Amino acid sequence: MTMMTPPPLDQQEDEEMLVPNPDLVEGPQPMEVAQTDPAATAVENPPPEDPPSLKFTWTIPMFTRLNTRKHYSDVFVVGGYKWRILIFPKGNNVDHLSMYLDVADAANLPYGWSRYSQFSLAVVNQVNNRYSIRKETQHQFNARESDWGFTSFMPLSELYEPTRGYLVNDTVLIEAEVAVRKVLDYWSYDSKKETGFVGLKNQGATCYMNSLLQTLYHIPYFRKAVYHMPTTENDAPTASIPLALQSLFYKLQYNDTSVATKELTKSFGWDTYDSFMQHDVQELNRVLCEKLEDKMKGTVVEGTIQKLFEGHHMNYIECINVDYKSTRKESFYDLQLDVKGCKDVYASFDKYVEVERLEGDNKYHAEGHDLQDAKKGVLFIDFPPVLQLQLKRFEYDFMRDTMVKINDRYEFPLQLDLDREDGRYLSPDADKSVRNLYTLHSVLVHSGGVHGGHYYAFIRPTLSDQWYKFDDERVTKEDVKRALEEQYGGEEELPQNNPGFNNPPFKFTKYSNAYMLVYIRESDKDKIICNVDEKDIAEHLRVRLKKEQEEKEDKRKYKAQAHLFTTIKVARDDDITEQIGKNIYFDLVDHEKVRSFRIQKQTPFQQFKEEVAKEFGVPVQLQRFWIWAKRQNHTYRPNRPLSPNEELQTVGQIREASNKANNAELKLFLEIERGPDDLPIPPPEKTSEDILLFFKLYDPENAVLRYVGRLMVKSSSKPMDIVGQLNKMAGFAPDEEIELFEEIKFEPCVMCEQIDKKTSFRLCQIEDGDIICYQKPLSIEESEFRYPDVPSFLEYVQNRELVRFRTLEKPKEDEFTMELSKLHTYDDVVERVAEKLGLDDPSKLRLTSHNCYSQQPKPQPIKYRGVDHLSDMLVHYNQTSDILYYEVLDIPLPELQGLKTLKVAFHSATKDEVIIHNIRLPKQSTVGDVINELKTKVELSHQDAELRLLEVFFHKIYKIFPSTERIENINDQYWTLRAEEIPEEEKNIGPNDRLIHVYHFTKEAGQNQQVQNFGEPFFLVIHEGETLEEIKTRIQKKLHVPDEDFAKWKFASFSMGRPDYLLDTDVVYNRFQRRDVYGAWEQYLGLEHIDNAPKRAYAANQNRHAYEKPVKIYN
């Protein structure tokens, strides 16, 4: 099923945000809470069973023009249910694309509805599908979690970078594979009641940590050791790893609901970003155990980590022809086992101890015996009581220069016998009296791909037949088939529920598979699976956690009673004086920084005034309160005083009457009049003729604005009537001349207009809460001040921007900083930067904007006068940056823009080298002009050599440019432009000869066997009747491949991407049609061999989103 969605024109953004409710779920994927009809009681009908699955493709054109925060696909139906895909094109509060599967009609479904789905979401790479990013998960959808997916699906920097292949012609392709499964009753499920265990809350992407912590917790000997680590009542859990781990384990043992891990991650010294980074379980396991081992030193539990997890193996090299053997003993806490090419754990151990022969060019230099043939290998001296096996599901693919996940089937037994075949894994020094028979305790699972996914664990805490699945907050009982066989990996075929139709079976590649195994030695079982109870837990820890529980209960009550209270925020003159000119310049006050009171809604307002009297020392009868109001121009001003009748009401009644937004807050301004002795006095009576005005004073010499007070004036009076009072407030002479301006608004632009002092306030449309700014008029000399009047100063304050400038050559380093205005024109900006750099000609400056997602310069620089203002230079989609990059050109930018610069890789015919040349020519030039220019720069094999220009991408030739093609149509940002000499054999090609593409390739190991191209593609002339054997001789000579290596090469003709392997006697000519059009879909001759060539320095890495920060625990 394929859908094309038109770009949204007026799609309204939903009010609510997709963020987890901290009281419900802290899963790795945010959920959207859908409102259900409480009156409806019927449960949704069970789903029809046909079809159970569907692949849905969503094409999103004009992707970069999407201006909504959320964007939905059209609705599609799977299993009788309506679904849609939800994306956040600019990220859901992260710098990654966020993508979810959403229940399309969640708001209209009956009470208690639920559905369960296994699904994968993908962003398709439209240039090379192998680089598509796909993630898989499963979820129980319901009213409280009506969508599920991935907040950090892929970096926005990758998605929006055109060369990566995800955004082509401003179009993005998204795929969803959805299979509906049997519904589980999720929200009524009680893990503790059903299993006796509780789960761990997820901080965003910490399921990898949760699965490890559950595994360690369920090794009782380890848990007991953690409890016995010395801690004190003065330790803070957020600063002490032992105390935080003790606290976590205690809660897992005794809580009735899921446990948070924030204290523990804070004790690691992790910031929020770290907590949301998905790391590697093995890496975290090692770092955590090293930290604990270090903190256990000098305590009663010193050495516990070694006793549990440490084993030893012997590395040996033994000469074959002389009596010489070298051995080295090493310890291990876990073993890394190969998955690729191994059917099970035993095959991995066989490979681990496999003997390598050192001979030929790889002989071993034995001390006293020179170079010798030798055997090299590893054997185990002893295994630990708790054996941790890390399965190498992820590995680096050198051909693709990226990490890949291996989803091959890999089996592991319930009982692992490492004494098999007469102890073939053991060294001669091993203690043969120890029986190395192990029982499986835990299976840690990774679901997803190399770019992220979900982690959970199957554990049997007492080694009984009963398995449990620990999936973040949810713990369920599972059978052995779920814990073992379903975690082997490989492919899973979903059952066909409609046998009457001949539908092909729907296969899911099982992205969920075992990633780490924990085995416990049978002979140590009773010691490891020991009893742990309260007597193992320090008294101070029990007291602390009981107190925590009481505080948590208080918070719960606080939240439960929140609807009974309101918050009153009281602003005073003191607050305005404190804030204006320092923290804020516009309006009067930041209400987040004034005194707030939490008052029961039923409290009489008079009683609240008594609270204020105690707080501020102002008697009740001397207080007058004003209601704040948000005006249509988005300013916020005191609007009117509370009436005597209103003051007889309750706090809740006043809030409801005054607050159209119906939020929990009531904002008030407390008017306090003070006498000559600065003591409070009764406020003057206010009639309908009186208006309350606020005044700010501007000092143009020092560019300072401050609040000087307020006055009650008659609306019929004129500003000139209060000049004396204003001069007194400012500290001016009584008859000082002043200019007055009304501060009207500041969003989206500043509006500040001069007031005619001879016109009444009423005619000036001045009303309660208005702000008047005033200053002394300036002399001619003083008018040269940078901001001579109030409007210019407010304009400056609103638009000032501190811009960091960096050179394009050093895009990570700030060169200098300049304060500019967002209203500065293009010319203003380059003139100021040129002045800073001491550059005479500003037109020789070229600026480049900043990509907020990739944290790099944008690919295209800013054109000469290509933007109106500085603000246009700093905006990137919905983000605003404060960084600009600059470069100094050798010619003026307008002249340069008439030229086109192409980056051409010249492949020399005489030397094994590739040299990059930047060819700069007028845009109307042709490819022939590029070739002529290139000839002046490169060394040719002979004087009459002819050159051609090719378009190469992903190791395939897509095009030979005709010499007449204009270069303005060529884009070297997407493709590699390759120039080379035309071989003589191609010039002399006969009428029956054919010119074919020849590409190098290799096949991926494992079950997929996907073809991967690499190396430099080339053309080859083949003749009628010519066999592969004859062609091979020419290819070997052309590529200078040694006989020994060439003998291992295989040859195949490719059509539609499928190889057909050739024999030496096959006539190659017959496999290829004569065509003049070239493209990746064409036929080609494939050369299969290992890629041993070093990577070219100029080759772009096509897949860089596997970046992963290493795990660090700082404390």
Swiss-Prot record:
Disruption phenotype: The double mutant ubp12 ubp13 roots are completely insensitive to exogenous applied hormone peptide RGF1 associated with an accelerated RGF1-induced ubiquitination and turnover of RGFR1 and are characterized by a reduced number of cortical meristem cells and disturbed PLT1 and PLT2 expression. GO terms for cellular component: cytoplasm; cytosol; nucleus; plasmodesma. InterPro entries: MATH/TRAF_dom (IPR002083), Papain-like_cys_pep_sf (IPR038765), Peptidase_C19 (IPR050164), Peptidase_C19_UCH (IPR001394), TRAF-like (IPR008974), USP7_ICP0-binding_dom (IPR024729), USP_C (IPR029346), USP_CS (IPR018200). Signal peptide: none annotated. Residues 53-178 form the MATH domain. One of its GO terms (molecular function) is cysteine-type deubiquitinase activity. CDD domains: MATH, peptidase_C19C. One of its GO terms (biological process) is protein modification by small protein removal. The keyword Cytoplasm does not apply. It catalyses: Thiol-dependent hydrolysis of ester, thioester, amide, peptide and isopeptide bonds formed by the C-terminal Gly of ubiquitin (a 76-residue protein attached to proteins as an intracellular targeting signal). SMART domains: MATH. The keyword Protease applies. Residues 1-51 are annotated as: Disordered. The active site is at C207, H454. Its EC number is 3.4.19.12. Residues 198-522 form the USP domain. Keywords: Hydrolase, Protease, Thiol protease, Ubl conjugation pathway. Pfam families: MATH_2, UCH, USP7_C2, USP7_ICP0_bdg. Interacts with SIC/RON3. Interacts with RGI1 and RGI2. Belongs to the peptidase C19 family. Recognizes and hydrolyzes the peptide bond at the C-terminal Gly of ubiquitin. Involved in the processing of poly-ubiquitin precursors as well as that of ubiquitinated proteins. Positive regulator of root meristem development that, together with UBP12, prevents the ubiquitination and turnover of RGFR1 induced by the RGF1 hormone peptide, thus influencing PLT1 and PLT2 expression. This is Ubiquitin C-terminal hydrolase 13.
